[in-house]
Amino acid sequence: MEASSRVTVQVLLLALVVQVTLSQHWSYGWLPGGKRSVGELEATIRMMGTGGVVSLPEEASAQTQERLRPYNVIKDDSSPFDRKKRFPNK
């Protein structure tokens, strides 16, 4: 009985491997073989045809500089491994 169940499991595993290797994955906009249709590619390029330049509002630069300031400025004389500050009970 052990041999027949082992053969059954092997046949099922082989069938699963064959099914997975022979199946075709179809994505939206892709043709078999991983090739994209030229019409869709052309439409995508037209949508992205902004000249590669993204304009930012002038007010955003002041807000960005405020956001990029560090919250905590570390003093040069303090050590990050100062045990007395980190572990006051020891």
Curated annotation (Swiss-Prot):
A Pfam family that the UniProt record links to this protein: GnRH
Localisation: Secreted
Residues with Glycine amide modification: G33
Cellular component annotations (GO), alphabetically ordered: extracellular space
GO molecular function: gonadotropin hormone-releasing hormone activity; gonadotropin-releasing hormone receptor binding
Keyword Signal in annotation: yes
Signal among keywords: yes
Domain of life: Eukaryota
Keywords assigned: Amidation, Cleavage on pair of basic residues, Hormone, Pyrrolidone carboxylic acid, Secreted, Signal
Signal peptide start-end: 1-23
Positions of post-translational Pyrrolidone carboxylic acid modification: Q24
InterPro entries from the UniProt entry: GnRH (IPR002012), Gonadoliberin (IPR019792)
Function statement: Stimulates the secretion of gonadotropins.
Family statement: Belongs to the GnRH family.
This protein's name: Progonadoliberin-3
